[in-house]
Design a protein with these regions (language model features):
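Acidic, metal-coordinating catalytic segment for phosphate/diphosphate chemistry
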Residues: 1-43
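Conserved hydrophobic/aromatic beta-strand scaffold that supports enzyme active sites
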Residues: 3, 23, 44, 53, ...
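Surface-exposed, flexible loop/turn segments at secondary-structure boundaries
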Residues: 12, 51, 59, 105-107, ...
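Short connector loops at helix/strand junctions that flank enzyme active sites
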Residues: 21, 36-40, 46-48, 60-62, ...
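Flexible, active-site-adjacent loop/turn segments at secondary-structure boundaries
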Residues: 31-32, 63-65, 70, 122, ...
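Conserved Nudix-box catalytic region and its N-terminal flanking loop in Nudix hydrolases
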Residues: 46-88
Length: 137
């Protein structure tokens, strides 16, 4: 980050008064553009004793199998995001269950949340970000 999104002045890394972390601070208007981890939300779509996985069509990890997941959008709950990602990546309708896992990956500034989800039917197919989708035991 080089310039302030509020006034366009240069920003510098320093510890603001009363803070404990070094942050970018605008040298003009003193705005602090806080940088926080991204939330990645997903679900574990279940049908009987099987799990629905998606083979990625895009980077990162193109061609590998994964659970449907993606970034939380503004104005949505984490449960809504989990259901949306299953719909976008696997055209799968699911009922969101309990939170299954929550873990931090500080080396890439991300926090992952996965919910259990029950597939409502077997009418699923690859979305734009998936090469194929399949149930696995």
């Amino acid at each position: 980050m080089k310039f302030c999104s509020q006034c366009g002045a240069l920003v510098a890394r320093r510890t603001p008064p009363g803070d404990t972390h070094e942050r970018f601070v605008c040298e003009g208007c003193q705005t602090i553009p806080y940088q926080t981890p991204k939330l990645v939300i997903g679900c574990i779509p279940e049908w009987e004793d099987r799990i629905l996985l998606c083979r990625r069509a895009i980077e990162p990890r193109s061609g590998l199998w994964t659970l449907p997941a993606g970034f939380l959008e503004l104005s949505e709950t984490t449960a809504q995001a989990a259901a949306r990602e299953a719909l976008e990546e696997a055209n799968a309708a699911i009922e969101i269950g309990e939170l299954y896992s929550l873990y931090s990956l500080p080396h890439i500034d991300q926090v992952y949340m996965f919910y259990r989800g029950r597939l409502l039917n077997l009418d699923f197919s690859p979305g734009d970000e998936s090469l194929e989708v399949q149930l696995f035991s």
